[in-house]
Amino acid sequence: MTSLSLVKKVIIGMLMCCFMLVNNIAGANPLPDPDTWAESACLIDAEDNGVLYGKDEDKIMHPASTTKIMTAIVALESGKLDEPLVITPEAVNTEPSSLGLRLGDKITLREALTGMMIVSGNDAAVAVAQTVAGSVPAFAKMMNDKAKELGAKNTHFVNPHGLTNYKHYSTAHDMAIIASYAMKKPEFRQMVNKQAYNMKYMDGHTVYVTTTNRFLKSGFYGANGIKTGFTNAAGDCLVASATRGKKTMIAVFYNDDYRWDDAPNWLEFGFSFYDKSELK
């Protein structure tokens, strides 16, 4: 073989490798960086929790009712889902939003937890905490222990519902990590993907509840959760999730007047990093 022929073969081989590389990348077509009005926001790929985009994602924020994602995690891992919910005057009198629990109601922890995630009931959050841990402070410790375990380093909980307390805080990045963990639990995914639900009481009657999450009802391809939030201190909050194929994106927005617009834009941006064949 002449040296010229060898050089030609090497060049052809290099060109073929380049073509294959470009062809693999060509399936992905990343969109322009998305805008947001959020004070803090974070987008992650739930497979490895890698941050795809963010805005002040490590800023300490009031998490409002996105807190209930951790409340659900701790409750789901308690082993008490089929036990009767403990409903105390403290729970019933908790500041709204409310699931409408009354003293004497008979309902399992599982059903109340589902209602809590759909309606964002603060009364249910307190009842869940007291059922699982005996008291709100004891439950908050369980929440903080779990946050530490998950690597949510800038998060501290003092209650299960997210009503404003300046010792109760998180970040968009931390909450994305927490939500990613939660979405790997099949029962959690079922709870937060419901637009409406007939909550079943132990005496046989049901109560129809509907979601506070407009994103879930938006028609966005793959939308499957997760949780809204609002307090005067926190502003409008949203943890949004969507799954296409084996890819799940999670976006968190804190203090965002345009959360319903930002969520689909950011999630679509996340999916644009991947070949369409991965999203089927």
Model-inferred region functions:
Residues 2-28:
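Sec-dependent N-terminal signal peptides of Gram-positive bacterial secreted proteins and lipoproteins
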Residues 152-153, 164-280:
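Domain-terminus/edge residues, biased toward the C-terminal soluble/receptor-binding domains
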